[in-house]
Amino acid sequence: MRIGHGVDVHKLVKGEDLVLGGVQIPSDLGLKGHSDADVLIHAIMDAMLGSLALGDIGKHFPDDDPRYHQIDSKVLLKKTYQLITSYGYQLINLDSTIMAEKPKLAPYIDEMRITISDVLDLYPSQIGIKATTFEKLGFVGSGQGIMAQAVVLMERLY
């Protein structure tokens, strides 16, 4: 068994879409990034890569590579999981937290779980997603950005 932990942060700006867990969230502000800036999926990818000591998403999908400009993070998540399975591991459980002052994310959590489970070909019961605020403290609390953390448990298949 292997455990991995991942964290990602992106700045909120006008003129960008807000995509979290592969789901488009209605919002006046979106996340700025080279890809679609999906902090939740990026944290999950980093956790997966970290579980096998394979570096981080910047190593595998550099932000100066035009192939990844505005790419859907679900595509990168699929590629990351294919890499993990090529090493003989599978995801047993994933737990994650999105930290955002607004918008309220509770109405979208189930859709995120289903979206991620579809990409990874897992059961939604293997995907935990929670949302919380920073109680108006720091960059998240002031609405400057959104942060996500993820922890994964991997099991060797063979």
Curated annotation (Swiss-Prot):
Pfam family, one: YgbB
CDD domains given in the database record: MECDP_synthase
Residues binding a divalent metal cation: 8, 10, 42
Annotated signal sequence range: none
Enzyme Commission designation: 4.6.1.12
InterPro entries: MECDP_synthase (IPR003526), MECDP_synthase_CS (IPR020555), MECDP_synthase_sf (IPR036571)
Keyword entries, A-Z: Isoprene biosynthesis, Lyase, Metal-binding
Cofactor field: a divalent metal cation
Binding site for 4-CDP-2-C-methyl-D-erythritol 2-phosphate: 8-10, 34-35, 56-58, 61-65, 132-135, 139
Residues the record marks as site: Transition state stabilizer: 34, 133
Entry's transmembrane regions: none
Biological processes annotated in GO: isopentenyl diphosphate biosynthetic process, methylerythritol 4-phosphate pathway; terpenoid biosynthetic process
Catalytic activity: 4-CDP-2-C-methyl-D-erythritol 2-phosphate = 2-C-methyl-D-erythritol 2,4-cyclic diphosphate + CMP
GO molecular function: 2-C-methyl-D-erythritol 2,4-cyclodiphosphate synthase activity; metal ion binding
Function description: Involved in the biosynthesis of isopentenyl diphosphate (IPP) and dimethylallyl diphosphate (DMAPP), two major building blocks of isoprenoid compounds. Catalyzes the conversion of 4-diphosphocytidyl-2-C-methyl-D-erythritol 2-phosphate (CDP-ME2P) to 2-C-methyl-D-erythritol 2,4-cyclodiphosphate (ME-CPP) with a corresponding release of cytidine 5-monophosphate (CMP).
Family: Belongs to the IspF family.
Oligomer and partners: Homotrimer.
Annotated protein name in UniProt: 2-C-methyl-D-erythritol 2,4-cyclodiphosphate synthase
